């Protein structure tokens, strides 16, 4: 949830499009880090009171029986790699095994692309205008493009994005009146070659921008809701695939408990890459 982990010093301290958070091999690792890095910070305008950390003292081994989970693998009807979709759709069935009720459903987040691209361009213009102007030869083309996009925006673009984001937020709030958590893929493609800067297409559908392949992630970022990504399987080439779990605001401990239950039921974290064996 925005503010639980105080953001680092930023040119846009009221930014609500992203938040810092931990990474770890297991949910326990992430849980421990959350206990350490969360809390109040007088130097940032978006922060939670120190007392909120008491919620992180609950055990990870929570009661998951009867939780209502919505699976939205086709969210926004955006393109997604067939193998990634099949793996994540099969993986969500594991929640049934641990006592959850799973339904196929998703909220209306159709305008998330416009909102995300607008706010991202706005922030790039603030963060990188000096880099692009003073050191153009040291800045890659995607950063130049995103910065220029921000410089060319008008006030009406931000106004539209703000109105659309309000509707997205309300759609999510209403959605969580019916479900406890929302599950969807982490990205639209499996890991790709280090020699490829970004995917140009997904399932034969050409992408418009360098960031489009990450639509499952940034769609959730626009909502401002807490999320956690966990491994859920491997491709035919033994590449990892992830599923993300999303909850309503302030459901962080519940998300960690759900992720922990899934982790214990699947034990994907114990799988080592072929390069290690």
Where are these predicted regions, by residue range?
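Hydrophobic alpha-helical segments in the ANL/AMP-binding
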Residues: 210-223
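Short, surface-exposed loop/helix-turn segments at secondary-structure junctions
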Residues: 47-50, 160, 192-213
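Short connector loops at secondary-structure junctions
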Residues: 100-116, 147-150
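Short glycine/threonine-rich loop-to-helix capping motif typified by GTGT followed
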Residues: 82-84, 110-123, 193-199
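Acyltransferase
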Residues: 55, 80-106, 128-134, 158, ...
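Short helix-loop capping/hinge segments that flank enzyme active sites or metal/cofactor-binding pockets
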Residues: 61-72, 119-173, 185, 189, ...
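Structural helix-boundary/capping segments
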Residues: 1-70, 75, 89-98, 153, ...
């Amino acid at each position: 949830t925005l503010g639980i982990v105080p953001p680092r010093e930023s040119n846009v301290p009221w930014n609500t499009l992203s938040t810092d958070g931990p990474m770890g091999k297991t949910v326990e690792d992430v849980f421990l880090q959350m206990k350490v890095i969360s809390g109040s910070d007088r130097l940032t305008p978006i922060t939670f009171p120190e007392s909120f950390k008491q919620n992180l003292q609950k055990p990870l081994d929570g009661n998951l029986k009867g939780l209502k989970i919505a699976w939205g693998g086709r969210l926004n009807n955006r393109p997604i790699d067939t193998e990634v979709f099949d793996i994540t759709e099969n993986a969500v069935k594991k929640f049934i095994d641990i006592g959850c009720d799973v339904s196929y459903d998703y909220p209306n987040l159709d305008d998330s692309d416009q909102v995300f691209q607008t706010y991202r361009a706005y922030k790039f213009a603030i963060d990188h205008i000096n880099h692009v102007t003073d050191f153009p030869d040291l800045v890659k083309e995607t950063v130049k493009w995103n910065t220029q996009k921000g410089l060319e925006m008008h006030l009406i673009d931000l106004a539209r994005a703000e109105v659309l984001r309000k509707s997205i937020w309300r759609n999510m709030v209403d959605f969580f009146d019916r479900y406890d958590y929302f599950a969807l893929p982490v990205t639209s493609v499996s890991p790709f070659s280090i020699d490829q800067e970004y995917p140009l297409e997904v399932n034969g559908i050409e992408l418009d921008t360098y960031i489009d392949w990450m639509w499952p992630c940034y769609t959730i970022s626009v909502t401002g809701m807490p999320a956690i990504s966990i491994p859920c399987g491997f491709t035919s080439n033994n590449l990892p695939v992830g599923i993300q779990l999303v909850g309503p605001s302030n459901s962080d401990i519940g998300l960690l408990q759900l992720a922990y239950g899934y982790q214990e039921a699947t034990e994907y974290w114990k799988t080592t890459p072929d390069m290690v064996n």
